[in-house]
Amino acid sequence: MKRKDLVKHLIENGCVLFREGGKYSVFQNPVNGKETPVTRHLELAEFAARKICKALEIPQP
């Protein structure tokens, strides 16, 4: 999955960019306060995208 598609999915489901790290962008779900890092690679493995969504408690892409 492309990173831009995952970021779009996160934003559509109410998540916000919390902060920028060295190699990661940290997204937060303001509804439940959960945070998770999203790597800046152009391509993400499907299991990684599922894990990010599960950590933020949003639907899978």
Ranges and model annotations:
Residues 1-2, 61:
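Absolute protein N-terminus
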Residues 2-15:
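Amphipathic alpha-helical segments
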Residues 3-4, 24, 41, 52:
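Hydrophobic alpha-helical segments, especially transmembrane helices
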Residues 6-8, 27, 56:
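Intrinsically disordered and other compositionally biased segments
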Residues 12-13, 30-61:
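C-terminal structural segments of small proteins and small subunits
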Residues 13-29:
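Major-groove DNA-recognition helix of helix-turn-helix-type DNA-binding domains
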